[in-house]
Amino acid sequence: MNTLLKLLLKGLLPLIAFVVLGLFIASLAIDANRFKPEIESAAASAGIELAVEGDIAWQLLPLGIALNQVNFTLNNKSMAGNADQLAISVNFKTLASLISQSPQLPISHIKVKNSRVLLAIPNSLPVQLSQINLAVDNINTQGQPFTYSIDLLAPYSVRISSSAALNIALNDQQQPESFSVNNLDLSINDLSIKGYVEGSEGLNKIQGQLSADSFDLIKQLKVVSRFIPELEAPRMVDPKALTDIAFEGFFDLVLDGFSTIQSTLSIDGQAIEISSEIDQENLKLYTAISANQLKLDGYASQSNSGSANPVLFAPLAIPMALWHGQSQMELNIAELNIGAASLTNIYGNLIGNQNIFRLSSLSGDFFDGQINLSGELNMQSRTPSFSVDSSVSNIDLNRASQLFDDLNLGGELNFSSNIKGSGYDGYSVMQSLAGSGQLVINSPRYQGINLEQTLCNAAALFSGKMPAVKDWSEDTQLDDLTASLSLRGNSLSVTEYSTQLGNVDFYGSSSLNLSSLRYKLNATVLATQERSSSMGCTINPMIVEREIPFKCKGAVGGTFNCKPDNSLIKTLLLSPKL
């Protein structure tokens, strides 16, 4: 639309000079329609094919001319359209500019009524804007304020409107020296943005403040997805998630110097403070993100309710990904809640340079322990690669196991691992995963099943006796458990794990499918003495110092299913009693 107005002003300027000189004398006596050929010819010289199909009328208050039923097409075919009326008025104060060759245009008002514009976009379908109404009053480029208002209908019934008070000053070379946009009000359907913007020092310095009242982000994303089908609005567990978004930001930008941005983003009533410092001279970007509390329950995807939807945090990393120099982002969150889990005192430090991003630290307190992560993402090659080092220390398993139904564990978890992978989508990344780790659980306890009781019952069965009636504990208390871990693709293997229950050793291996969360556990039980423990049962000498394998399988969070190896049971039952 701006291009069209510039061309129209350029093409109609000779006509305006002619009209102004005789307008007072001849406005009532001369029919303005006689100037149609001159108007259309002047427009053609400016690269506009113009056809005025309606009447042309003089305007006295303010002084100007109105063209009705106007059709136009740019010679390069990039824009075409029509308008019910195009009205241009003259400013008497700048009338002398026609003679003095002053750069100030003598036009004071422009009004467009009910216009329709068809824009040709390269490699895409044309875009039509309709119901365009534009009014610009008291136009000048000498630093005096003037106003504009516009409203239009974009494709897919998107209603756009805007108004503001403008101030523009040009230097002697007709380049912008300063500008201001005050009382800005921009509306796109239900989204309303207000604020001001000021530019100075030849537009090298730009300051301002912008804010948006509460709006529905999901609804806005659905509108955008009509134009960009690849962008799909997320579907979350809580239908009200991301429906109450607001922001306010202040910025002080120096295009070739040091800039700052301070903003507050409210996501469904949860405030996130974001501050940025931009050093253009040294090509450095620093961003700090902080929040008191974030609850992520409602932001889980409907297709995967166990994790937060990445759309919530992905935009925060965009500046670092696009920055052309060194970048750093620090994260401070006092408390992060996901279901019954609470992660506190979260700190993160991410550094980027030349498409290599290093996570030097991501830590937080979790179930009386601490989690620490570090890693690197290399995006310099066609196939991105990454590595992650993690450590978990002193996690209270009794509290952590409450996150899962039918899973009751106790003890203190310590864990360390290194994982590497590469790929350009979720599937290729999963298939490339490789890593190893060490697991230590101090004083592990499994609640709801007593393995010693199971062992004693099996021993009684092997000896041909009924199991003794005892007041067994409902839990299994083990000695410290250690294990080695190996990751290949979506399969996590636990090898060389071992622990002890009284006079009985447990060791073996297991595997977990990370996609289905189904596990297989192969455990070997070895009784080293003839009693399971000082308070336990007598073990048949037949199975003392003899390995007894158990096979367990199931899904995480499901019922624990574990039984001795059938072939060994048959062998023991058929063996002669000692």
Language-model regions, residue ranges each:
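Solvent-exposed loop/turn tips at the surfaces of repeat/solenoid architectures
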Residues: V70, A83-L86, I110-S115, I132, ...
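Elongated, acidic membrane-bridging lipid-handling scaffolds
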Residues: V90, I99-I206, F313-G352
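Terminal hydrophobic membrane-targeting helix
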Residues: G22-I110, F550
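Amphipathic hydrophobic-ligand
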Residues: E49-L50, N76-V90, N123-L134, S157-A165, ...
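Flexible, surface-exposed loop regions and adjacent strand-edge segments
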Residues: P126, V224-E230, S303-G306, E452-A458
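Hydrophobic residues on conserved beta-strands that form the core of alpha/beta folds
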Residues: V52-E53, L67, A83, I107, ...
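Hydrophobic membrane-insertion alpha-helices, especially the h-region
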Residues: K10-I25
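Solvent-exposed beta-strand/coil patches in large extracellular/periplasmic or lumenal scaffold regions
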Residues: Q101-Q104, V112, P145, M236-T264, ...
